[in-house]
């Protein structure tokens, strides 16, 4: 007998409708009356705060200092470095009038310019280097086709901006942060990934090198989930950021930037959610345990016991206590929609038997657990929960990754929703043709081939220079 699912939409049949429904019924956000803007509801914001907590631990170990910079950028400053911010021009929010001032201002689409202005005015000599800064903030980019978390006109992120004495130091730190992102996405968020370098056509225009982390959604589309950029001296020369060296001469700094945004919440939802609702890895789940009274919410002894359990387990887990008179079915449904890792139910008869009903989010199987064994049961659940999530996601991931030798194969596999690995000559001309013909873009270079390679490019038949992934993307 098939049980009715909590959602009307099926993730397998129509992931777009499913995504819209699961976000709404999971109470993560509220749509604003301004296109592309949304309010984070408490559970949605809690996820972002938990992501922030995990990443901040890593940043603190690297002596990255947190600060906060202004939201407005002078349009004159923006035009000064327009070529390095290419791609933002058509999607800017511009403040056209401020009191009697004639100069226009831009709501930041990113903060390289703000950091450059700060460093130019405060950096004096080599003793201040390296500078490692980070801010948690929102940025603004006009979007025509918006989806909550995946594509918003205002979104939240963290952005690291750092500067160094040498190119090697700048690149090494960019790579270190890139590897940190890979560990975070794989080990904490339980999402399989592909990592590599962006092509010249796809990298951040102001970067010498862009390192990316790409995740693959269940429909085969790629989601750029984190990037780290070696900016070399591109910004420091444009903004004249110089410091006095040990030799008493002056040199431009080398800089890098990196970031992860609330888009990663969309990746978590699409990777782990199911037709009953949201599912979250333990480190970022708003609630680990939903603890509920059933059948008799006026029973003082029962309520006292539930509060005792809530106080006990709140020392280790995030607990949602519910002593309202909801039906058992409604309690389980709401817990699954919300993405609680497990739901615990206790009624008067359970109290007499010294037991509790236990349902975990992954298996959804109902078990009766003696309260004397509940500690052990929870330990067992949370010691394997993330591993099970990752293995489930990895199984889907492996069905979406494929290889193509020829362009004909490539077209077929892209059309069927695959994340396709190919050998490629790495020339911008062909990248544009590929996008026009298939809708796929290059996602990341995973390997540079040596001169002796016998591999041929899948589209030009020229000698291949790289091994690379292409996919359609969000």
Curated annotation (Swiss-Prot):
Its main location: cytoplasm. It comes from the Bacteria. The keyword Ligase applies. One of its GO terms (biological process) is prolyl-tRNA aminoacylation. SUPFAM superfamilies: C-terminal domain of ProRS, Class II aaRS ABD-related, Class II aaRS and biotin synthetases. Its EC number is 6.1.1.15. CDD domains: ProRS_core_arch_euk (cd00778). It is found in: Cytoplasm. Pfam families: HGTP_anticodon (PF03129), ProRS-C_1 (PF09180), tRNA-synt_2b (PF00587). GO terms for cellular component: aminoacyl-tRNA synthetase multienzyme complex; cytoplasm. Keywords: Aminoacyl-tRNA synthetase, ATP-binding, Cytoplasm, Ligase, Nucleotide-binding, Protein biosynthesis. InterPro entries: aa-tRNA-synt_IIb (IPR002314), aa-tRNA-synth_II (IPR006195), aa-tRNA-synth_II/BPL/LPL (IPR045864), Anticodon-bd (IPR004154), Anticodon-bd_dom_sf (IPR036621), Pro-tRNA-ligase_IIa (IPR002316), Pro-tRNA-ligase_IIa_arc-type (IPR004499), Pro-tRNA_ligase_II_C (IPR016061). It catalyses: tRNA(Pro) + L-proline + ATP = L-prolyl-tRNA(Pro) + AMP + diphosphate. One of its GO terms (molecular function) is proline-tRNA ligase activity. Belongs to the class-II aminoacyl-tRNA synthetase family. ProS type 3 subfamily. HAMAP family: Pro_tRNA_synth_type3 (MF_01571). Consists of three domains: the N-terminal catalytic domain, the anticodon-binding domain and the C-terminal extension. Homodimer. Catalyzes the attachment of proline to tRNA(Pro) in a two-step reaction: proline is first activated by ATP to form Pro-AMP and then transferred to the acceptor end of tRNA(Pro). This is Proline--tRNA ligase. It comes from Mycoplasmoides gallisepticum (strain R(low / passage 15 / clone 2)). The lineage of its organism: Bacteria, Bacillati, Mycoplasmatota, Mycoplasmoidales, Mycoplasmoidaceae.
């Amino acid at each position: 007998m098939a049980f009715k699912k909590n959602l009307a939409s099926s993730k397998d049949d129509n992931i777009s409708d499913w995504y819209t429904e699961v976000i709404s019924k999971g109470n993560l956000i509220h749509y604003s009356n301004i296109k592309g803007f949304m309010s984070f509801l408490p559970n949605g914001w809690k996820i972002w705060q938990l992501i922030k907590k995990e990443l901040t631990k890593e940043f603190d170990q690297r002596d990255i200092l947190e600060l906060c910079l202004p939201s407005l950028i002078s349009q004159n400053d923006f035009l000064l470095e327009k070529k390095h911010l290419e791609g933002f021009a058509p999607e800017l929010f511009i403040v056209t009038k401020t009191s009697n001032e004639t100069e226009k201002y831009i709501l930041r689409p990113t903060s390289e310019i703000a950091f450059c202005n700060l460093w130019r005015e405060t950096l004096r000599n080599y003793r201040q280097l390296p500078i490692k800064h980070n801010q948690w903030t929102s940025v603004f980019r006009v979007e025509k086709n918006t989806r909550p978390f995946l594509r918003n006109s205002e979104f939240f992120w963290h952005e690291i901006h750092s500067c160094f004495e040498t190119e090697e130091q700048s690149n090494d730190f960019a790579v270190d942060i890139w590897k940190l992102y890979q560990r975070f996405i794989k080990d904490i968020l339980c999402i399989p990934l592909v990592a590599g370098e962006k092509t010249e056509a796809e990298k951040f225009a102001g970067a010498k090198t862009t390192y990316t982390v790409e995740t693959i959604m269940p429909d085969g589309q790629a989601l750029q989930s984190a990037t780290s950029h070696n900016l070399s001296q591109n910004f420091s020369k444009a903004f004249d950021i110089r410091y006095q060296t040990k030799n008493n001469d002056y040199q431009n700094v080398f800089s890098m930037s990196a970031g992860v945004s609330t888009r990663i919440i969309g990746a978590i939802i699409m990777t782990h959610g199911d037709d009953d609702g949201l599912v979250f890895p333990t480190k970022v789940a708003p609630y680990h345990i939903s603890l509920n009274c059933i059948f008799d919410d006026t029973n003082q002894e029962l309520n006292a016991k539930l509060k005792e359990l809530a106080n006990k387990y709140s020392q280790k887990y995030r607990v949602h206590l519910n002593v309202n008179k909801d039906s058992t079915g409604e309690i389980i449904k709401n817990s699954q929609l919300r993405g609680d890792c497990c739901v615990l139910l206790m009624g008067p008869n359970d109290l007499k038997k010294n037991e509790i009903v236990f349902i975990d989010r992954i298996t959804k199987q109902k078990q009766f657990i003696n309260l004397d064994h509940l500690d052990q049961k929870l330990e067992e659940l949370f010691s394997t929960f993330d591993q099970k999530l990752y293995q489930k996601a990895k199984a889907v991931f492996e069905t979406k990754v494929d290889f193509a030798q020829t362009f004909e194969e490539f077209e077929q596999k892209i059309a069927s929703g695959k994340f396709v690995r190919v050998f490629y000559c790495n020339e911008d001309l062909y990248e544009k043709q590929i996008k026009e013909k298939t809708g796929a873009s290059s996602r990341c270079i995973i390997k540079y081939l040596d001169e002796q390679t016998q591999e041929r490019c899948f589209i030009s038949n020229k000698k291949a220079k790289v091994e690379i992934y292409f996919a359609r993307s969000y």
